[in-house]
A protein has these predicted regions:
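Hydrophobic ligand-binding cavity/cleft-lining segments
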Residues: 1-57
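A conserved amphipathic terminal alpha-helix motif
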Residues: 81-82, 132-162
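Exposed alpha-helical structural elements
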Residues: 11, 21, 59-63, 134, ...
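Glycine-rich portal/gate segments that line the openings of hydrophobic small-molecule binding cavities
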Residues: 36-91
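Subset-of-secretome marker
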Residues: 23, 37-47, 95, 141, ...
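Short, solvent-exposed secondary-structure boundary motifs
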Residues: 23-31, 67-71, 95-100
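Beta-strand/loop substructures that line and gate deep hydrophobic ligand-binding cavities in soluble
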Residues: 49-50, 74, 79, 86-140
């Protein structure tokens, strides 16, 4: 998965290091509840972010509710390196409380002709016999939509529209 920004790598990375950005991004996420659990800035320009988002069970598709009762509480961690040579890398993990689901991924933010490009690769694992693959595909498609929404929000944030 990849998404492009009109702004340069430095501006995008600067947003990722801003607590106000994360609070606003979470508020814009569409989750029923969203919180910034922690943000830690390193002296090298790195940033570690932990978030929790809750989706109420009434909003979940049948494919999900037949295997998970109640609300989905999604924890996500992003650990971005500081900028080096107009580039930053991240390790991203996600899990759902009480569900046999895990997401692990790697992201690269680097310069492009248009400004910056974020490339994201993720592995989704659902440990449910027989239907795990269907759920993995569903979650993968949701990740694509989420990446697009986050790119649009980040673009608006950098432009001062949020």
């Amino acid at each position: 998965m990849a998404t492009d920004y009109d702004a340069g790598v430095g501006k995008v990375h600067s947003a990722f290091c801003d607590e106000r950005y994360w609070v606003a991004r979470l508020a814009d996420s569409g989750a029923d509840e969203a919180r910034l659990d922690s943000i830690t800035l390193g002296p090298d320009g790195s940033v570690d972010v932990v978030t929790t988002q809750v989706l109420r069970s009434t909003r979940l598709p049948a494919l999900v509710t037949q295997f998970h009762r109640g609300d989905l509480e999604i924890q996500r961690e992003e650990s971005w390196t500081g900028l080096a040579d107009d580039r930053a890398d991240a390790v991203i993990t996600g899990s759902i409380s009480g569900a046999p689901v895990s997401v692990t991924g790697h992201a690269e933010l680097e310069a492009s002709d248009a400004g910056a490009r974020l490339t994201f690769q993720a592995d989704v694992t659902v440990r449910v016999p027989l239907v795990g693959g269907k759920l993995e595909n569903f979650i993968g498609n949701q990740l694509l939509e989420l990446l697009g929404a986050e790119q649009r929000f980040t673009t608006r944030w950098i432009a001062g529209e949020c």
